[in-house]
């Protein structure tokens, strides 16, 4: 996340170090013509390299909670044991911003927004993060990065004929980061990531119903004061109420909920 969860140039409004900062897109558009990136030449390694560089850019341009911050301490406690999960090497940080979101990238980077942490219990956060890990494991994040690379209209930055992506300028990284966060997963991809998140909770003996309660919280937000923002974020997702019901049905079948 998008996913958690969407063509503009610059990405972030940075209000240095405050919890009132907002992670947002401005309304400028990329003027260059879109150039094709053939799937055959855009590898997993390309996606991971671009993702790492884009996330590094976002980390520099957002208020990241330091190691001694209560948000970081809490996330370490919740998720620290899962940095190596299902063959993936994961890293995580907290952005101290007012938007409610979390996302994962093709290099295994997971970023959680402090406003999401404020509204979720520990196990609900694990459900959200498990969902995001699902997008990485299912290669959804690779496909999103390839699409972002195309939308950012800088495919001529590709290096050799082997398809290895060369170093990018700061403005190019900002454009790719922006396009990456605007990427939307299909409903099928979201449902499959939900299944992965459920199984992540089940495998580690967490309360699987935390995923249902997380969806219900998002559903309540989408009908409240933040309706327009939440509706935009969730527009490509299956209905949150339906997602909660699907979790309940699985839990009943597995004997984990009555």
Predicted segment positions?
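Bacterial N-terminal signal peptides that target proteins for export
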Residues: 1-8
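Bacterial N-terminal signal peptides
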Residues: 8-16
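Sec/Tat signal peptide C-region and signal peptidase I cleavage site
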Residues: 17-21
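A Zn2+-metalloprotease active-site environment signal
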Residues: 22-258
């Amino acid at each position: 996340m998008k996913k958690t969860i969407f063509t503009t140039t610059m990405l972030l409004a940075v209000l240095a170090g405050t919890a009132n900062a907002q992670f947002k897109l401005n309304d400028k558009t990329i003027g260059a013509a879109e150039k094709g990136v053939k799937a055959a030449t855009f590898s997993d390694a390309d996606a991971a390299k671009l993702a790492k560089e884009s996330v590094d850019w976002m980390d520099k341009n957002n208020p990241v909670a330091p190691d001694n911050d209560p948000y970081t301490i809490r996330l370490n406690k919740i998720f620290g044991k899962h940095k190596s999960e299902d063959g993936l090497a994961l890293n995580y940080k907290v952005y101290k911003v007012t938007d409610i979101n979390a996302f994962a990238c093709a290099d295994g980077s997971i970023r959680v927004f402090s406003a999401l942490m404020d509204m979720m219990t520990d196990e609900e956060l694990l459900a959200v993060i498990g969902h995001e890990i699902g997008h990485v494991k299912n290669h959804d994040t690779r496909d999103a990065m390839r699409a972002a690379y195309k939308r950012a209209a800088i495919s001529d930055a590709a290096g050799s004929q082997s398809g290895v992506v060369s170093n990018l300028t700061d403005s190019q990284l900002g454009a790719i980061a922006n396009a990456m966060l605007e990427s939307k997963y299909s409903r099928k991809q979201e449902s499959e990531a939900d299944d992965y998140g459920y199984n992540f909770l089940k495998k580690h003996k967490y309360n699987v119903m935390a995923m249902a309660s997380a969806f219900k919280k998002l559903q309540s937000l989408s009908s409240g004061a933040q309706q327009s923002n939440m509706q935009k974020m969730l527009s490509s997702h299956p209905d949150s109420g339906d997602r909660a019901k699907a979790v309940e049905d699985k839990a009943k079948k597995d004997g984990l909920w009555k």
